[in-house]
């Protein structure tokens, strides 16, 4: 795999999408530092924190199982996932089906 891919900040489309019961979200971090990856419902309410902490440069992935921060299954619908660092942010949409 091309090493240049790891030098960019990026957020991949989740797969599968639509999903049930879980989906994988891949992302790349350009430099070591604080990273957060959160899931929001269509109204903008944060429903799940998937990553929150310092990560090394490179490619990372996380699996979301449709469970919110309170341990409850979320409703079917469209969700936004947002990757943020100290200097950059990017969002994408995903669909949870029941």
Which role fits each region the language model picked out?
Residues 51-87:
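Short, surface-exposed loop/turn motifs with a glycine/proline- and acidic-biased composition
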Residues 1-15, 19-40, 49-52, 61-64:
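Glycine-centered coil/turn sites that cap beta-strands in beta-rich domains
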Residues 88-92:
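Extracellular and select intracellular beta-sandwich modules with Ser/Thr-enriched
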Residues 45:
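Conserved Rossmann-like nucleotide-cofactor binding loop
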Residues 41-42, 68:
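Short, acidic, Ser/Thr-enriched surface-loop or helix-capping motifs
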Residues 94-98:
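Short beta-strand edge segments in extracellular beta-sheet folds
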